[in-house]
Amino acid sequence: KIHNSDYVLGDTKPSNAIWSKNKVYFTDLEHTKQYGNKAWDIGEFICFASKFSFNYDIIREIINKFIDGYLETGDKRDLKKLVNSNILKIFIPMLTVKTFNIIKNIVEKRVKNY
């Protein structure tokens, strides 16, 4: 919904979100702006959400559920921009090689389906 209003958060780490009764409240909004890079928001969230797990099935589930949810109201072109940019590469230092490859492969595969 935020992206549909042409806003980006700029700092979409899961730790900057509070979940309560099926609603999400965002904190740490000093990087929020209008008409920013939505692909950055998507990439940052996916990478940080995957960072702390070594259970690769859970990582796959997190990524796929996020993409499913995003596509309910978001624009699939934003996912294509993520695939066609170097955004995911920025997060390589904080991820294992396997985690990075899982993220990259899932996002690329999901984009090809559109």
What are these regions (language model features)?
Residues N16-F26:
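Conserved protein kinase catalytic/activation segment
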Residues K13, S20, F48:
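Conserved residues at the C-terminal ends of beta-strands
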Residues K1-D6, T99:
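An alpha-helical support segment within catalytic cores of ATP-dependent transferases
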